[in-house]
Amino acid sequence: MISSLNGILEASGKDWAVINVSGVGFRCYMPATSPALIGGLGQRVRVFTHLHVREDALSLFGFATTEELSLFETLIDVSGIGPKLGLAMLSVMNAEALASAIISGNAELLSTIPGIGKKTSSRIILELKDKIAKNWEAGVLSQVTEANSDILATLTALGYSSSEAAKAISSLGDNGDLPLEERIKLALNYFNNK
């Protein structure tokens, strides 16, 4: 129904923003990182939205990118994952890190998200692994082994794209015997030496 909003950012909080579109202020629930990404107060912004309809409420969820929106809509298709939990997942991990954790089958990483236990993380992986792999940079992410999926998640959480992170991981060679912290340092050195 409402696929995007284009207007002036009037107010924002930790997980919401009010966008004024032609004199009407729309309150959107957003991942915790999104209000800072879309722009500053008083600036023209564009937010991609999902309208969630319940019998007692209409809730608008906004995202900085279409990728975030697509992942959110895919997540809430899983039984037991509602919009609030889907939003919480995208607040803890950015869309690329979350997608790579699901594609690589990293249930431990997913279960670190508040509200997601081992059973739920396993169900998410089972139901969404193939679906998300089709929609995301599956070619790049498939080069990342399960042993290096934590490095991929860390680098994407630091703001690197999944393709940049995959290049850094491929530069590591066979260092699987090193502790995770050392492999992350080596991957970060890849960006310092560029």
Swiss-Prot record:
Region (Flexible linker): 144-149
Region (Domain III): 149-194
Gene3D superfamilies: 5' to 3' exonuclease, C-terminal subdomain, DNA helicase RuvA subunit, C-terminal domain, Nucleic acid-binding proteins
Region span, Domain I: 1-64
Primary residence: cytoplasm
UniProt xrefs under Pfam families: HHH_5, RuvA_C, RuvA_N
GO MF annotations in UniProt: ATP binding; four-way junction DNA binding; four-way junction helicase activity
InterPro entries in alphabetical order: DNA_helicase_Holl-junc_RuvA_I, Hlx-hairpin-Hlx_DNA-bd_motif, NA-bd_OB-fold, RuvA, RuvA_2-like, RuvA_C, RuvA_C_sf
GO-annotated cellular components: cytoplasm; Holliday junction helicase complex; Holliday junction resolvase complex
KW DNA damage (keyword) present: yes
Keywords of the record: Cytoplasm, DNA damage, DNA recombination, DNA repair, DNA-binding
One Gene Ontology term from the biological process aspect of the record: DNA recombination
Recorded domain comment: Has three domains with a flexible linker between the domains II and III and assumes an 'L' shape. Domain III is highly mobile and contacts RuvB.
Complex and partners: Homotetramer. Forms an RuvA(8)-RuvB(12)-Holliday junction (HJ) complex. HJ DNA is sandwiched between 2 RuvA tetramers; dsDNA enters through RuvA and exits via RuvB. An RuvB hexamer assembles on each DNA strand where it exits the tetramer. Each RuvB hexamer is contacted by two RuvA subunits (via domain III) on 2 adjacent RuvB subunits; this complex drives branch migration. In the full resolvosome a probable DNA-RuvA(4)-RuvB(12)-RuvC(2) complex forms which resolves the HJ.
Family the entry assigns: Belongs to the RuvA family.
Primary role: The RuvA-RuvB-RuvC complex processes Holliday junction (HJ) DNA during genetic recombination and DNA repair, while the RuvA-RuvB complex plays an important role in the rescue of blocked DNA replication forks via replication fork reversal (RFR). RuvA specifically binds to HJ cruciform DNA, conferring on it an open structure. The RuvB hexamer acts as an ATP-dependent pump, pulling dsDNA into and through the RuvAB complex. HJ branch migration allows RuvC to scan DNA until it finds its consensus sequence, where it cleaves and resolves the cruciform DNA.
Cross-referenced HAMAP family: DNA_HJ_migration_RuvA (MF_00031)
Name listed for the protein in its UniProt record: Holliday junction branch migration complex subunit RuvA
Originating organism: Dehalococcoides mccartyi (strain CBDB1)
